Amino acid sequence: MANIKSAKKRIKVTETKTLNNRMIKSALKTVIKKFEAAVAGNNVEEAKTVFVAVTKSLDVAASKGVVHKNMAARKKSRLAAKLNAMA
């Protein structure tokens, strides 16, 4: 356990940031699964609307540093390819 005041603060801050990052990642995974389900069900209209949400979520996560920007770009590219294959 930390004895120095700044170390104690860092522990609190790290726990808070970890929780926020976990929430963002969880929401991201949920919306990606929703998109995958729409693609699997051949629901083009729903897939298009969910794709916009996926793109926004990936951009937010990348801008906040939760995921790497290249990972976000790769995911968007692969999901866009799936969407285009449906149409």
From Swiss-Prot:
InterPro entries noted in UniProt: Ribosomal_bS20 (IPR002583), Ribosomal_bS20_sf (IPR036510)
Keywords, in A-Z order: Ribonucleoprotein, Ribosomal protein, RNA-binding, rRNA-binding
One MF annotation (Gene Ontology) recorded for this entry: small ribosomal subunit rRNA binding
Keyword Ribonucleoprotein: yes
GO CC annotation terms, alphabetical: cytosol; small ribosomal subunit
One Pfam family hit: Ribosomal_S20p
Biological process terms in GO annotation: translation
PANTHER family in UniProt: 30S RIBOSOMAL PROTEIN S20, SMALL RIBOSOMAL SUBUNIT PROTEIN BS20C
Protein name in the entry: Small ribosomal subunit protein bS20
